[in-house]
Structures are given as structure tokens and as C-alpha cells.
């Protein structure tokens, strides 16, 4: 299902049937789901700035309500909801977040995270109350080729474009995009209805990530760590300046956070094997270079 205004460069070579419509249109969703045995819901607004909560709610929550209703109306066999790791509480490197952790990131005041959490809870409620054949996958920060927009690949491009590289004090879990795709397939084949599965690769601080990027790319850079209090102060100023600021309190909070997870449950139950993050970075670098992003 593709909205009429979508940029489809990233999928032109995929042999698939497409349906033109919008996920926030109940009529479009009902028509798109008709005749499907399995539905994968991966669409959402992921931008962390310049978006009102009403827009997040419409695309991330209300659309999920429409899609689950359509799945039940058309008696689909399986529904895979692609959520985010941040609906699950993160942890440290020594004790990373797992599927038993509750939601703890409400303090981040992120419209994206909050709307995804509400949508995930709605899916799980429909599983319990109305027998929706739903399974949730929770990918971490995805890296790899074919990032047309780019989305998460902006972090790599940022690391390539600066001789003096300022980086935040926190860290996160990085996962190869192909491992996430494989995780979705395995969830269809092996996942248990009503369960959540973190799709989580390797935990790295931002300093470790950029040093790895520096080594793989061969770039010569001076790296400077930004103190947390400086970043958070700048984030507060950005929030006061309005929704257009790329750095607001929510993004600053997340950049300072130890945002670490484990994918052991998906390794055990979905039989996933995670690719080293070096391969994900190398694949992204090669693709960006071939397509003239740098």
C-alpha cells in the first residue's frame, strides 16, 4: 500500500502488486486488506521534529486502529505490527532492555515514541479481547543499504560530512536492516500470537559508532564529545523556539540516554542470527557512495 504522493524509488525493482491509498483512510485500508492472508504494518511517521502530536496520532495510532479492524473484518491469518524498541524500557550495556521491561520513555516527551506505544498497546489489547492474530516486532536503530530518504542513514552521512565531529554522550542498539526484514519473516513463520520480539543487534555508544565509521570509511576526523548538560540545554532552547527545530528537548534527552537492548528472545524463538554492525555500516556506505549521497 503506497500513498499517492510517495517517493517509490526504493521499491521500483521489487516484484510486487501495489495499492494506491492512505493508511489514515478507513475506506482505503479496508480495500487494501481485502484478499490478504498476512498483513505487515510498517508505515508510520518517524520524524522527531516539526510534527504535531495530532499528525503522529493520525498516522501512527488511528491508522493502526483502521488496519487491525480491517484484518479482523477480512479474517487475515496473521498481522505483524512493526513497532519500535523504544516502547520497551532500555537498559545498560551490562543489563540491556528486554521484552519484560515496561514502557519508561514517557519522560522523553516524544510524539513518535508515545504514539507508537499507544498503537502497540492497542494491538495487544485487540489480540486479547478480539482474537486478532497479531504479533509485534520491535526493531532498534536500523542501518544498511537502500536508505533512499535517507532516514537512519542520516547518522552515517553526518559522520562523513564533518572534519570536526561532535557526538552525543549516549548510545543505542544498531541492527542491520536485512536482519529486521528477516525477523519479520521469521515472526510470520515462528512468532507467537500476542508476543513482542526485539530485533536488536549490537549496543554501541555514539563515540564507538563514529569511531567504527571512521575506521571503515578511512576518514580523518577530530572527534569531540558533547557534555550532556550542554546538549539538554540546547534542546530546551530548541523546544522553546518551536516545532521546527531539529534539536528539541526530546531529541536531546534520547541522545544522552543509554538506549541499549538485547535480541536474545528473537535469536532463541525466531532463530535469528544478527549481522555485525560493521557489515551494516559498510553496506550503507557502499550504497550511499554508489548513489551519489557523498
Residue ranges, per PLM feature:
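NAD(P)H-binding glycine-rich loop region in Rossmannoid oxidoreductase-like domains
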Residues: 5-10, 16-62, 70
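Flexible, glycine-rich beta-alpha linker
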Residues: 87-89, 111, 132-154
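Conserved Rossmann-fold NAD(P)-dependent oxidoreductase catalytic core, especially the SDR/UDP-sugar
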Residues: 65-111
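Substrate-positioning beta->alpha
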Residues: 118, 150-151, 168-189, 195
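Active-site Tyr-X1-5-Lys
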Residues: 107-135
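A conserved pocket-lining segment of Rossmann-fold NAD(P)-dependent short-chain dehydrogenase/reductase
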Residues: 105-107, 157-175, 179
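Mid/C-terminal beta-alpha module of Rossmann-like enzyme folds, strongest
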Residues: 183-246, 263, 268, 276-294
Amino acid at each position: 500500500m503506497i500513498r499517492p504522493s510517495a517517493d517509490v524509488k526504493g521499491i521500483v525493482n521489487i516484484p510486487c502488486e501495489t495499492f494506491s491509498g492512505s493508511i489514515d483512510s478507513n475506506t482505503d485500508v479496508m480495500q487494501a486488506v481485502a484478499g490478504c492472508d498476512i498483513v505487515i504494518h510498517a508505515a508510520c511517521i518517524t520524524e522527531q521534529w516539526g510534527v504535531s502530536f495530532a499528525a503522529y496520532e493520525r498516522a501512527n495510532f488511528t491508522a493502526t486502529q483502521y488496519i487491525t479492524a480491517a484484518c479482523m473484518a477480512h479474517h487475515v491469518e496473521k498481522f505483524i505490527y512493526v513497532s519500535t524498541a523504544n516502547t520497551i524500557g532500555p537498559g545498560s550495556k551490562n543489563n540491556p532492555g528486554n521484552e519484560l521491561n515496561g514502557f519508561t520513555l514517557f519522560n522523553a516527551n516524544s510524539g513518535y515514541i508515545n504514539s507508537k506505544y499507544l498503537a502497540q498497546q492497542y494491538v495487544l489489547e485487540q489480540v486479547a479481547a478480539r482474537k486478532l492474530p497479531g504479533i509485534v516486532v520491535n526493531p532498534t536503530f536500523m542501518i544498511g543499504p537502500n536508505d533512499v530518504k535517507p532516514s537512519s542513514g542520516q547518522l552515517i552521512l553526518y559522520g562523513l560530512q564533518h572534519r570536526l565531529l561532535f557526538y552525543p554522550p549516549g548510545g543505542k542498539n544498531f541492527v542491520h536492516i536485512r536482519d529486521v526484514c528477516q525477523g519479520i519473516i521469521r515472526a510470520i513463520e515462528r512468532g507467537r500470537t500476542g508476543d513482542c520480539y526485539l530485533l536488536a543487534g549490537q549496543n554501541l555508544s555514539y563515540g564507538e559508532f563514529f569511531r567504527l565509521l571512521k575506521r571503515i570509511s578511512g576518514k580523518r576526523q577530530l572527534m569531540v564529545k558533547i557534555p550532556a548538560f550542554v546538549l539538554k540545554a540546547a534542546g530546551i532552547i530548541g523546544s522553546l523556539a518551536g516545532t521546527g527545530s531539529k534539536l528539541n528537548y526530546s531529541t536531546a534527552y534520547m541522545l544522552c540516554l543509554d538506549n541499549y537492548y538485547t535480541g536474545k528472545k528473537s535469536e532463541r524463538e525466531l532463530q535469528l542470527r544478527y549481522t555485525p554492525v560493521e557489515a551494516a555500516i559498510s553496506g550503507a556506505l557502499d550504497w550511499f557512495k554508489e548513489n551519489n549521497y557523498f
